[in-house]
Every structure is written in structure tokens, then in C-alpha cells.
Amino acid sequence: MTSINKVPPSIYTRSCPNCGGNISSQRLFNGSVCESCLKDDREFSNLSDLINILSENSNLKNLTQIRDVLEEYKKVEEIFGKLLNNSKPIGPQRSWTIRFLRGESFAIIAPPGLGKTTFGLIMSLYNATRNRKSIIIFPTRTLISQTVDKLAKFSELYSYSPRILYNKQSPTQTENILDQLKSGNFDIFISTNRFVIQNLSELSNIKFDFIFVDDVDAALKSGKSAKAILRLVGFTDEDIQTTMKLLRENIGEEEKFGKIQEIRESRLKDKIVIFSSATISRGNPILSSLMGFRPGSSVIYLRNIYDSYIDLTQTCKGQDFEECTLGTVIKLLKRLNDGTLIFVPIDKGAQYADYLASNLRDHGINVESVASSSISKLEKFERGEVSSLVGVATHYGVLVRGIDLPWRVKYSIFVGIPKFKFKIGEYMHPLALTRLLSLVYLVKNDDKVRGLLSYIRKRLRKISPAALAMLAKDIREGKIDDERLKEAYNLVNEYLKDNEFLKKVSDVGDLVIEGDYILMPDYLTYIQASGRTSRLYGANLTTGLSVLLIDNSRLFELLNKKLNLILDEVKWYSLDIDADKLGQVSLSDISAKITEERESLSKIKKEGNVESSSLSVKTTLFIVESPNKAKTISNFFSRPSTRSYGKLRVYETVLGDRVLIVAASGGHIYDLITEDESEKQDDNYVYGVLVKDSKFIPIYSTIKKCEKGHQIVKDLSQNKCPICGSRIVTDKTEVVDILRKLALEVDEVLIGTDPDTEGEKIAWDIYLAIRPFNGNIKRAEFHEVTRRAILNAIKNPREFNDNLVKSQIVRRIEDRWIGFKLSRKLQTEFWEQHCTSISKKNSKDEECKENRNLSAGRVQTPVLDWVVNRYQKYNENKKKYLIIESQDKSIFPFSVLALKKNGLSKNTQIIIHLEDINIKEEEFGPLPPYTTDTLLSDAANLLRIPASDTMRVAQDLFELGLITYHRTDSTRVSNVGISVAETYLKSKQVDISKIFRPRSWGEGGAHEAIRPTKPLDETMLKASIEQGDLELSKQLTFNHFRVYNLIFRRFITSQLPPLVVTKQIVRIRAYTKDNIELELDENKKEFVIGYKLKEGDEFRQTLQDAIYTLFRLYQPLDEKMKGKELSATITGTLNKSDVQLYTEGELISEMKSKQIGRPSTYAVIISTLKKRRYIIESKNLKKIIPTKLGMAVKEYLMENYKQIVSEKRTVKLLEKMNEVEEGKVDYLVLLKELYNEIQTIS
């Protein structure tokens, strides 16, 4: 349980877990129920104790079903104890069991050693004791034989003998088995996939209550076998066709999946279906849609590997390269000895693998080369009869994907960098084709190319690794039946003939051009192949050693760049065999550690006690706000399995010592209730807050939304919107129910909402809502959505910060009280006066009823005051100017403003005299990285993106893991951030010593400036997305890239030397042809004609995509123009003032400097003023102008309530709120002050 000094009192309506009534925060914090359900106010450490007390008091209501599940769980736990030497289910098994007992179907994707098959067998045994029938499906008869033996042993230990049937080979036995199945004379039927497909018509008519598919990857290897599984579950051919049609239809997601859900619920009914696998290479969308869950994929990014290298380009200098390479491999194998996988480049192929293996055997090394058909050699390696294997480094190769032996594989050796290599003009590998097509699209921006790319990607995603290998072979041999594929090859090869295009592609796309050949690092193959040395086995992630023999230095740089992008950071160790050194570490020590681990695993495997290694594995529910963030996080560790609960999608993945279940709350779940004054229960109720005995108790209800988009925060008696009468489509009560369900099945809950007061309050509300269902709940804090940051947050959870919670409570109540009180005044009293006045002026007789679109707020009112005052001063100082433009804009591109004179009008000829031309240099920057206010200001001023849009874009970029948290007033850069800049600069091949100036820009602390999380400029980001290196859960728009580019440039420039800006200053006069002197707005023009880096300027061109500049570059005027006259013309007039109107950016800067608002509210304040039509933005110059309504509102509020909404009072109050956040001020004292203040509003 979390430690909070004193729980802030509040009431949550309809949130009692037992009766659905109102309940206090203290009771939820205690893991209890409401007073109506239990008079005693006591604390419960677990749900079982609470249920027992309620049962004793005969007051068990909504928790009855959970009581039944927990009682059955105890029985299953007893079975586990009897069968597994008094062992209880480990974390994942407990989660699976609870889901099973709730009647859920789901997928288990977990590594060997977590007891998946054992779980399936025990649940089928449990089912048998309840007269329910089970079918367990395996890929091979060998596994069936082992399972029958295991079940026999289980039956003996449990003293219960279920009727077990299993399929045999002969037709007679098959017929006999089918007869027994039809008669129902069985409890457990054990079958192969093949038997199910061959006898589907008979088996689909037999009612199985529990279907357990032990190797779903094998079961889904073809559409036919996937269809067989669906038919066995009970789905008809018509169901499958309907689902296929619905998935293709262009209708809303809710309608589409609602119809599929109806099919699912009608067929599954009382059936439970569980898919189990250690890995899965592909999915089936129809099966996933109908089952309501999707199996995940193999865990390829979880690794504990020493990545080492030997640079053959240096060590083999002056020697025969092939002989030197062979000698290095021999020396390595004699040093490492046993358990090694050796990978040769795909361009050298299987022939070279055979050649290498033969040479190694000649040197006394026990090695075999393997291909896809070498099953016997793999088995020999597994038994230890062969010490090492040689195969081709290709992503579908048998050694890359087809071997999973954690107790056997120790080392990997790459004889050259894994790569795609092809001659320009030939048919390359289809995966290389997709990468090149994406680069063609980036450089040429050709929609036809984009269409081909999309088509080929979809095709490749649908086929199995074996089918991909066959396709690659056919293409290599010139057999291409697919016309669109052929068109893509022809198009790419045509482009590759253009040398200029090749240069552009190599700059953008991480490839090496060697003569007529193109080389691209195959980083996925390196990750997967080296990953064979570091596998999950139970709770253990084995240690591995990978040795990469570098045969191309540039390709190694590109490989490293890709690996850092995918894995966050890869540390490389230089390997010196003779010195026995791995970097500064002893090679012998690492080797001994690896060998000891493998011996331990071999012993566990031999003794058949796999589960004993998994006792520390636990299940963790990780809750975030947004679905995008949930998807991004779950994809860090694998392609997760998913399950759907209504509209909420839940992701499941594996992290070594835990199974991680990721879900999203969708932002705030609760908010202050919004009953009208007429609905008040008593006078102590003040706008959603109960005021009693000097206590302030906020009342919260779940947030609801209707079809028309209205948000409602009140308890409804009907499923109807009280505003418009439309149907309620979203009620966060559903989210609470789902999170409670998930919390019950896990060992711990971590709440990873945003790291600010709003995020803390969301987390606190979730904590209270689920506390009765799980007592082990903590806060996970992270400031960037990266693998490194998420792992750190999971490993280092913290307690809840009650000061942040109290601060948000104060802010929300203050916003509500002031907002509602003053808003009512505006909507009624003010509007009646204002509307009547307008009607009289317009000679109209209008009925001036209340105007509910009007609102006032503590912060928005001073900001409106600034806008109105600035506008008034602007008008007071406004003058009319003539616009004068040179007739030759190529010489002088600037407009000149002159005070209007009588007799001068449009098209009048004017002379501009260039009196003097000078040059000066100034240092510019570096500026610190962005904070929220500076980002919003720059985005508004430079990109003309409104603040509200910039915040939405930044929120997306944060959730997609591309930038750090965007609501911040810190300029600090962490060491991780500095390393991002360093990595980027190295990737641009600049001299770090000349140009890199690492700066932290602030003191230590949790918060950081807004910066990129990856060393990718805008062009590189686009390339990474197009090539599939980055798979984002949301498509980026034009504005996403523009804002990202701004953030990236500002950050990188903050780590560079200052810029030296060259300016030209031109002093001018203007007069008519009659020598009448004109009074100019300014008699000089100052503009930037160039810039350079103060140090390391030779790299400026290389870094042009990364340098932040606020200025536009102009062509310099020739100094010979000094004293010359230019012909010009008056082109128009404009009004100009000495006082400038605000832009959005300037208004935000003003809020920051005057300490009005916070990073999270700057955009909201401006957006609200626009929404209420108090201000508008001019079309061209984007200046903020108050409307007549805005000016009237400001005048009314300042005349009547200045003491409440003045800038001075607002700043003072915001300071006190910050002090609540820091624990310096009691939040109840501040609420009392606010309460007294609103009483003055009569």
C-alpha cells in the first residue's frame, strides 16, 4: 500500500466496488467499501478479506462474482500444490487462471519456463472435475506422447483419473477415437493440428468447453489451419465471410467491431479458448477480430549481450583478407570453444558457409553448416554432439529464427557485417526493395512510388518467413509473376542509374555505394541473430556474447546508427583475443559467467523443474493516459498480444522478470460533478464541493460523452445527454470496471501518467478506484517515452506525491468556483445589459436571455485585460503610412514606410536614396532548448501554428517517443540528452572536438527541457519512418514534422558554438521627384546576409538541417550602390502604431514573464478566449485583436470584480498554489481563503 500522510477527503459517486454507491476517498484508500455496505471504517490488505467480512454481514452484492472466482482459484491453487511439489501458481499463471475462471479467452505469448503447457494441462484437469470437456492441440505426436505421460503422473498425484483420449496414426484408431468423442466418453482430448484439419467436420460438431492450442504459431501457419481453429471454436463459414467483409468495409470502427463482437459473443458463449506460444511469426486478422484478442510475436528487443567487434579492416591490413578472416574465426572458436553460432553474409551465401565449415573442421573444430533442411544437425547441436553451427545471416535463416536453445547457445560470430548487397540494375532482395522504394519516395515525393511501396509492404507482411525466402529465390532467378512487384523493381533500377539521385539517396538513406554495388546494413538480422545468445528462460535472461568481424568501416557506422535507433543504445566492446580483453573487461570472466548460466539452465531443464526458475516472475499492470502511449510502450519489447474489453485495448508483453500488461485510461477518469444550482442537495454544496465544518470535500463523478461530443460530469438516470438529448457513447465507469478487472489478476500496478500535477491527480484517482482490488500500487514516472526511460520507471517506482494531488485539487476547485460564479454573472447580469445596449443601438427589439457561451476565469481575465489595453494603446498611437516599394526588387526587396502626406497617393513615383551601406557581425545564441512557452511562442511566430495546435502536436510527439515531456519550464538537459546530440553530430561525420559544446543548461532535477529523444533530424526521421525502422502508432502530419524540426534544431544548436551573424545596414532617405522629403518610419534597413559557426564553420553546410536560426537570409547589396538613387512607387497605405498588437507567441511570452498561467495552461487560456469570441486573430499578420464583446466583458469584470481577477491577485494566488505543490502551504487554508473570496461575489 502507498504511503500518504493524510488522504485528501473527497467523494467518488457510484464508485463503491460492492454496491455502486458513493464512497469516500479514505475508504477507497483503505481498500474498503462504502458506509452502507460496511459500517466499520477499517483497512483491508486484500480483496479476499473484504469479501469475507461482507459475506459474514450478508451484504455481498457486486463482489459476489469475484468471490466465486477467488474461491475457485483456491481450488486450482490446491491442484497446483499437489501436482507441483507444494508450489503455487507463479505470477503469470495466477493471471491466466483468474482470466480462465472469469470465462475469458486469450493468448499467452511467453518464453519457455513460465509453465504455459503446465497451466493448460492443470486447467483441463480442473475442468474434468467439473464435468467439462477440453481439447489440447499440439503440433507433433511426440509432444502428445509426452503430455499423456505427464497427465498420467498428474492424475496419480491428484488421485483423480480423467478420461483421456489422444489421436494415433492408424485409420482404425482414428475411427474409434471419433466415435468416443461423439459419444462424449472423454474428459480431455489431446490432438495434433493435422488431425483437427483432417477431421474438422466431425470435431466441429463436438462441444469442447476448453480449447487449448499449445503452439499457435504452428496452428496459424496457413489460412486453412487458422480457419480450422475458428470452426472448432464454433464459428461458421458465414461468420468468417461476414467478418472478412466487415474488415474491408469503410464504416466506423465502433460499428464494425460492434458487429464482430455480436458474432463472437453468440458463438463463444461458455467456451474458453487459449492460444499459447513462445513465439509467433505472423497473425491472422480475421481470427484476431473474431476471438477478441491478437497473439503477439517473439521478443526480439530484449537482450543482455556483450556486443563486441574485431576491425578486420585494420587487423588484416597488408594481408590476404580471406586468409586473415579465416584465421581470426579459427582463433575465436578455439578460444570460445562450445555453443557458438557463426553467421556469414547473405551475399556470400550457403556455399561460403559450407566452405567455412569445411576449413574449420580441417583445423579440428567440431562444426557443421546448416540450411533450412538441416534438422538433424540442429538436434546434434542441441545434444552437444556438435559444438558450433555455421549459417547465412538472413532474417529468415534457420540459425536466425529457427533456433531457441537458451541452455545451449552462448556466442555468435558474424563473419562480416549482415547486409543487403546487390548490383545496380539487378533484382535485389524484396526487403531491400522496400527500403530503396521508401528512399525514392522521400527524395522524389512521387505518389505512384508511395502506392507501390504500400502494396509491397502489405504483401510482405502477410507471408511467412519460408514464403519470403521462396519469393526472394524466385526474384533472384528472374521469376516475377506479380506485375506491380515487377513495376517497382523497374522503377527503382531506373532511378539508380542517375548518379545525382544515388548521391541524394546515400545522404538520406544509410547506404554505401561501392562501384556498381549498393550495400545496406541488415540491422534486424543482427538483432535477431545475436539475440539467439540471450534468451528468456523462465525469469532468466541469459547473458550472451556477440563478435562482429568488421569488413567495411562505413557500413559498421550505419549499422551502429540503426541499432541505436531501435535499441536506444548499444555499447560496443573492442575484442582482443590475445590480451583476453573485452574492452576493459576480462574475456575469461565473461565466458565463465556465460558457461555457468548455461550449466544451471541445463540442470533445470534436465530435472524437469523449469518452473523453479520462474518464481520471481510477476505480472505488472502499467497504466498510462493515452492509447497511443500504451501502444508505443508495449511495442518496445515485442509485438505485443492484445485483448479488447469494449473500446479499451489492452497490450501484453514480456520483460524478463515480469509480464507487462499495458492499458490506457484515456486521460482523466473523474472530474468535479456539475449539478446545476437547482439540483443542490443543501446549502453546503458549492459547485461540486461539499463545504462542511471548515472542510472542503470535492465530489467526483466519472466523465461521460454523448454522440454530439458534449462532456457530462454528473450521475445520469438515463443513457441520455442532458444538454442535447443524444445517446451517451462513453462513460469512464467502463474504464474503472476494466482497470479493476485487470488489477485483480496482477501482482502489482504501476501508474505511468504524465509527470505533472494533472498526471498525478489522474494517477491518484485511478489508484483509489482500483485500490480495493490490489494493494500493491505505485507511481511510475518518466519524462520521455523511450525503452530506457520506461525500464527505469518500472525498476524504480515511487510513492504518490500528495502535495501534487492537493495542488491539483486546489487548482480545479478554484477554477470551478471562480469560473462558475463569475460566468453566471456574465451569462445573466452582464449579458442582459450588453445585449439590451446593442439592441437599442441597432434599433432592434431582441429578447436578451442568458448567454451560456460566456465565461470568466482567474487567469484568462488578466490576459484579456492585456489584449484590450494593448489594443487601446495601439489605436491611440496609430498613424497612416505610405507603402513604398522599389521598382527593381532584385536590388532592394524591402518595403519602406513613410508618413502620409497630402497630395501623395498610390502609384506616385518616389526616389529612394541609399545614403550608406555598412556591414557588421554579431554573435547569436546559443539559446537553451525549448520550454513550453518558448516552443509555443516560436511555433506561433515562425510557423504560424496556433498554440492549441502546437500543444496537440507536441503531445503526439511525446506519446510516440520522439520528444521529451512538453509541459515544462525547465531548460535542463540530462546526460542522456547530451549523448543524443553527440550521437547525431558523430553520424554527420563532423569533428566533435571542434564543434560539440555539451551544455546541461540548468541544475539537476527530474524535469528536462523539450528535446528530441533520438539523434534524428527531420529528414532522417522521415527516412526512418518510411523505411520501417520506426513504426509509430500514429501517422505524422506536415505540422508534426515542422514542430519536430523546430525542437530538433533548437536543441542541437544549444550544444554547438555560437553563430556569428553578418548583417548589412543600409541607411536610406526617400523623397518625391519634386524633392519633397518624406518622413520615414525608419531610416535604415538592417538585415542578415550570412552566418557562420564561431568555431568549426567548415561543418556548417553538413549541419544545415540542424542549426536553429530566427532570421531570414537576404542577398547583400553591392557596396557600389552607396549613394545611388532607386526608382520606387507608392503601392498603398497602412495603419501603423508605435505600440504593436500582440501575436499569440508574444502573449505567451508575456504570460511566462508575468508568471500568469503554467506550461499546461498557456495554450488553453488563448484557446478559451478565442472560443468565447473575446479575441480574434488577424488573417495575415496573425495579430490578436479584442472583439467588442471581449472589451465589454473586460470592462464589466474590472469594474465589478477587480479585487478578484486583477493581475496582482492572480499572480499572488498562483504563487500560493505553487507553495501547496511544494508542501509549504496547507491546501485547506488556501481553499478557505478562496471560499471566503467567492462569498463576496453577490
UniProtKB/Swiss-Prot annotation:
**What does the record note about the cofactor?**
Binds 1 zinc ion per subunit.
Matching entries from SMART domains are given as: AAA, DEXDc, TOP1Ac, TOP1Bc, TOPRIM
Spell out the reaction equation it catalyses. ATP + H2O = ADP + phosphate + H(+)
Give the signal peptide as a residue range, or say none if absent. Answer: none
Amino acids binding Zn(2+) 2: 706, 710, 721, 724
**Binding residues for Mg(2+), per the UniProt record?**
625, 754
Q: How does activity depend on temperature?
A: Optimum temperature for reverse gyrase activity is 90 degrees Celsius, at lower temperatures fewer positive supercoils are introduced, under 60 degrees Celsius only relaxation of negative supercoils is seen in vitro. Active at 80 degrees, has higher activity at 88 degrees Celsius in vitro. Holliday junction resolution is optimal in vitro at 55 degrees Celsius, at 37 degrees Celsius no resolution occurs.
Chief localization: cytoplasm
Q: Which GO terms describe its molecular function?
A: ATP binding; ATP hydrolysis activity; DNA binding; DNA topoisomerase type II (double strand cut, ATP-hydrolyzing) activity; reverse gyrase activity; zinc ion binding
Region: Topoisomerase I, residue numbers: 615-1242
Domain of life here? Archaea
Which positions does the motif DEAD box occupy?
A: 214-217
- Record comment: activity regulation: At least one of the two reverse gyrase proteins is inhibited by actinomycin D. Highly sensitive to NaCl concentrations, maximal positive supercoiling is observed with 10 mM NaCl; as NaCl rises, supercoiling decreases. At 300 mM NaCl relaxes but does not introduce positive supercoils into negatively supercoiled substrate, at 400 mM NaCl does not relax DNA.
Toprim domain boundaries: 619-785
Role according to the record: Modifies the topological state of DNA by introducing positive supercoils in an ATP-dependent process. Increases the linking number in steps of +1. Involved in homeostatic control of DNA topology in balance with type II topoisomerase 6 (TopoVI); levels of TopoVI are constant at 80 and 88 degrees Celsius and TopoVI is probably less active at 88 degrees (characterized enzyme is from S.shibatae B12), so reverse gyrase mediates most of the fine-tuning of DNA topology. Changes the DNA linking number step-by-step in a distributive manner. Resolves 4-way Holliday junctions (HJ) with 20 bases in each arm in vitro, distorting the junction. Very high protein levels are required, but total enzyme content of the cell (there are 2 reverse gyrases in this organism) is estimated to be 20-200 molecules/cell. HJ resolution does not require either ATPase activity or the active tyrosine. The individual domains do not resolve HJs but do so when mixed. Also unwinds a fork substrate.
What is this protein called in UniProt?
A: Reverse gyrase 1
Species source reads Saccharolobus solfataricus (strain ATCC 35092 / DSM 1617 / JCM 11322 / P2) (Sulfolobus solfataricus)
Q: Report which gene this protein is encoded by.
A: rgy1
